[in-house]
Design a protein with these regions (language model features):
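Short alpha-helical transmembrane segments in multi-pass integral membrane proteins
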Residues: 1-20, 78-143, 189-241, 297-364, ...
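Residue-level signal for short hydrophobic patches within transmembrane helices
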Residues: 9, 13-32, 36, 59-66, ...
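Interfacial/gating helices of multi-pass transporter permease domains
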Residues: 18, 41-61, 127-132, 192-193, ...
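Transmembrane helical elements of multi-pass membrane transporters/channels
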Residues: 18-37, 139, 150, 173, ...
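Helix-terminus/linker motif at the lipid-water interface of multi-pass membrane proteins
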Residues: 28, 32-51, 120-127, 183-190, ...
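Hydrophobic transmembrane alpha-helices of multi-pass small-molecule transporters
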Residues: 62-65, 177-181, 206-211, 281-284, ...
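Short runs within selected transmembrane alpha-helices of multi-pass transporters and secretion channels
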Residues: 71, 140-158, 166-174, 195-208, ...
């Protein structure tokens, strides 16, 4: 066995921890990368500019989730072929994925740029920040192919058991983004446009470096392969499409939720946007653990080591409990200070109240998110996508129904009050599907 195969040889808790930790750190730096715009714009331009950037978040998340969902399909197949040592098929999937998704990202970029104003208007973006939001969004869409390709390549790195290179690239691009943000926003006075341009440049550099490093990484696996294969594309889409639908539909749902928040005014939106950034920091810890479980499961499925899949799932749940307690303690102790990091002196009492109330409520229930993400990660790794999709749609339906029906009548707090209930019901559905899969182990081996 080579050192690349530790996910199918080392003790599951050890292997998953070693594999997941760089991904968790990477998620942290990903959010530093994302939050740099918000913090720097909020402090050096003002809360209205922060609200303008925050107003774009729900929409940009839709497009990011398309990239993440596409990466899931490629990642599951790459992991499985890597685990079974079918390196030719693995490289064919890599090449087919990159070519197909490059075309898709270019089409989405053109669409997003062309309809930025229409989409922001449809979200009921406050009129005083509409033009600034559209400007930020259009610059974002120019760089979208870079972001798309980086996310695909990052998933492929983790699929072959390599989580340290994506971490290194994220640290580099985060530092570059912060430096460019400060220079363009504070020194050059370019405001929101400067923040968007800084992100575009950092994403471009990161995507190019990722491509070069990944191509070098897979050179060691000598085997013939096809640059494009329709059969592999079909297998890829069978896994990717449900994941794209799940992730993008959830993000569309978040856009609808934001359209409920927007009428409460710019300051309420600023407070909501600040806590959304904080939620993303902590939630991506659990997302990272779930994402680490998927290639662990896929590689062991390819190697026909079903018992290790169960052990890996239990290890993931243990990690989730540890980080849920950590998240609760941080938020309960420092929620006011965290809010001030984004809102600064320009934030009103309303902005601080919205941010603090939302943040503390989430802190009590992050464990629900953790167990949901771990269970979803195992389902993805096994290629069991239908119940995965159904569970996440039910989660979204609970969140939307409460926000749309109760928040306009009883206050903004109902936007986030149903979030934990959605997470918990999602977990129950996913766990039921997973338990059925484990009971039919012979079916797993045949996948």
């Amino acid at each position: 066995m080579t050192k690349d195969e530790y996910l199918i040889t080392d003790r599951p808790l050890k292997a998953l921890t070693i594999f997941a930790m760089p991904m968790i750190l990477g998620s942290f730096f990903q959010q530093v990368y994302n939050m740099a715009d918000s913090i720097i714009v909020g402090r050096f331009v003002g809360s209205s500019a922060l609200a303008a950037v925050g107003a774009c978040a729900a929409l940009t998340n839709v497009f990011i989730c398309v990239a993440l969902g596409a990466g899931v399909g490629a990642g599951v197949l790459v992991s499985r072929y890597f685990g079974s040592k079918e390196y030719g098929k693995m490289k064919t999937v890599v090449s087919t994925s990159l070519l197909s998704f490059l075309v898709l990202s270019l089409l989405l970029s053109v669409f997003g740029f062309s309809f930025s104003y229409v989409m922001m208007k449809a979200l009921q973006t406050p009129s005083d920040i509409l033009r600034t939001s559209v400007l930020y969004l259009r610059v974002y869409f120019i760089g979208f192919p870079f972001l798309f390709m980086y996310n695909i390549l990052s998933t492929m790195f983790t699929s072959v058991g390599e989580s340290k290179i994506p971490l290194g690239l994220l640290i580099f691009s985060s530092i570059l983004n912060i430096f460019l943000d400060l220079w363009m926003v504070r020194t050059l006075g370019l405001g929101v446009f400067g923040a968007a341009l800084a992100t575009l440049i950092a994403q471009g550099v990161s995507a190019v470096l990722s491509l070069l490093l990944f191509l070098y990484r897979i050179k060691r696996y000598q085997s013939s392969f096809s640059c494009f294969d329709l059969e592999e594309l079909s297998f890829l889409l069978r896994i990717a499409v449900p994941s794209v639908l799940q992730q993008s539909t959830v993000s569309v749902g978040m856009m609808i939720v934001q359209s409920v928040v927007n009428p409460f005014g710019t300051q309420a939106l600023a407070g909501y946007s600040a806590t959304m950034r904080v939620e993303n920091v902590f939630s991506l810890i659990f997302v990272s653990i779930g994402n680490a479980v998927s290639p662990f499961v896929s590689q062991n499925l390819g190697a026909k080591k079903i018992r290790r899949i169960k052990e890996g799932y239990h290890a993931a749940l243990l990690l989730d409990i540890v980080f849920a307690v950590f998240a609760f303690l941080i938020i309960e102790t420092l929620h006011t200070e965290i809010s001030s990091l984004f809102l600064g002196k320009d934030g009103t009492a309303l902005a601080y109240q919205v941010s603090s109330d939302y943040m503390r409520w989430l802190g009590y229930f992050f464990l629900f998110m953790g167990v949901k993400m771990a269970t979803d990660g195992v389902l993805r790794g096994l290629g069991i996508m239908r119940p995965f999709l159904v569970a996440n749609m039910v989660n979204l339906a609970i969140r939307l129904s409460v926000a749309l029906s109760l928040a306009p009548r009883f206050g903004i707090s109902f936007v986030w009050i149903a979030v934990p209930a959605g997470w918990f019901v999602n977990f129950l559905i996913s766990y039921y599907a997973l338990k059925k899969a484990f009971l039919g182990e012979s079916g797993l081996s045949a996948r």
